Amino acid sequence: MNASGNAGATADDHRPTLEDARAALSRHFGYEEFRPGQEAIIQAALMGCDSFAVMPTGSGKSVCYQLPAALFGGLTIVVSPLISLMADQVRALKEAGIRGSFYNSTLKPRVRPEVLRRALAGWYDIMYVAPERLTDPSFQEFAAQANISLVAVDEAHCVSQWGQDFRPAYRAIAGFVNLLPVRPPVMALTATATARVRTDISQLLELRSPVMQVTGFDRPNLRFVVLELRPKERERWLTGYLRTHPGDAGIVYAPTRKKVEQIAASLCEQGVLARAYHAGMSDAARDEAQRAFANDDALVLVATTAFGMGIDKSNVRFVVNCGLPLSIEEYYQEAGRAGRDGEPADCYLLWSRGDIRTCHFFIDNIEAEGLSGEERQRVIEGKERLLGEMIGYAMSSSCLRRRILRYFGQDVTMLSDGCGNCSVCDGETPQRYLSDEGISSRRSADTRAKSDPAAARVRSLREEDDFPPHDDDEEVFERLRTLRKELADQQGVPPYIVFSDATLRGMVRRRPRTAEELSAVSGVGKVKLERYGQAFLEALK
């Protein structure tokens, strides 16, 4: 630790600078500029200050702590509830040239001491930690000896009982930080938090004058559709939708384990590469399902809402909720799994009035471990209010995007005439989709990008370079996807970790012929250029 008491740097004249961070951004991730909000949060970490980032899913929150971790000499602790994702996150770090590890209940007891020993020896830049581990005496003993340069709290809304994913174990974070010999800067990150939840997070994490960045909640590449359909009609609709979207990866959410199994089995019978995912499955079965989906061996994952945050696959093209979520936060988290690569994606809510009874049942039987009876009642009342907002969204006759953004407190004056990219604004109805075959032919993403104002904005933002389209663009894109899958299987990583769909699209548009030209494609960093560059250049010939 340094004499200044800030674990994030050794001394003022040796602090990593923002220019160092920009160079690391290009080297590790292949991006030349920070995304909105990233610069201020990274600067705060480099200066040893606390920070709080509220940024949309897919906007690069993880880079906010990954870059400082790559520059600091110590260890960055990332507290995360996403145990099922940690192994993939560590693999992604390795692909980017950053040393990572994780510490959670999936590690065998005999392995845990070795992981901590290596961390003390300086083997890692980042360690992902489940919140439950923070109260483990052996981990606390390790932390007291470690050179911890930053504590990042991912999915920070989990600390608030007013948030949609309250996790009592998150309440231990502030105490853990206070036990450290020297307090490092603390960084809180979330994609969905109302003003009330943000205040709660700051207080419960005991953030000290944090640098705050709320970049907005809008995801202009996502198209929102609400269809009021009875349960039996939903499966018929889903079958038709998948028939018109062959090759697209997507997530289907269902409210119960039984319904998950039923939908997954039905899809498999129809030849769809689908997997079920829910808490009633064994750890091995869940891991297999998640791995198959991440590796593109399964195109559709049918899951209970417990899976809501547990996927980091960037090229999910659709999310379908077969039932009413308990809150707008929960719905936006789940819908936000779609289109993380910035490409157009669809978010469907299929619901009926009967879903409201199911939601009330879930709320009345909520688990509230560690809470008193009075606290539990407050949680239930809060959940009822959140459900009321969700019902209002489902029944809305005004712009769906505007309703979501207003709920999170964002200025919506720019949407006074509607977004042009939701079922209310573009006049979509169930009848337009349902037909004798189950669904009518829907516009393609490319067609929609040309005709819908919101999708057109996405396209204009994405295509900062002016490269004319080629007749064989889709053929070349599929060739690159096939190569990516082969390389990913060889490396034992999910395909999206090699390159995202957006990066492959950039290659297709630019048609680079040299390593230098390939490095100009957004998402191609030095590490990946050296590892995969030649193979992709050959495929582009």
Annotate each PLM feature.
Residues Q38-I41, M390, L504:
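Short alpha-helical "packing" element that flanks the helix-turn-helix/winged-helix DNA-binding module
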Residues T10-R15, E19-H28, E32-P36, A40-S62, ...:
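Helicase motor core with emphasis on the C-terminal RecA-like subdomain
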Residues M1-A21, R357-T358, I363, E367-R376, ...:
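Accessory DNA-binding and partner-docking regions appended to nucleic-acid-acting proteins
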Residues A44, N321, Y393, G506-M507:
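Short alpha-helical segment immediately N-terminal to, or the first helix within
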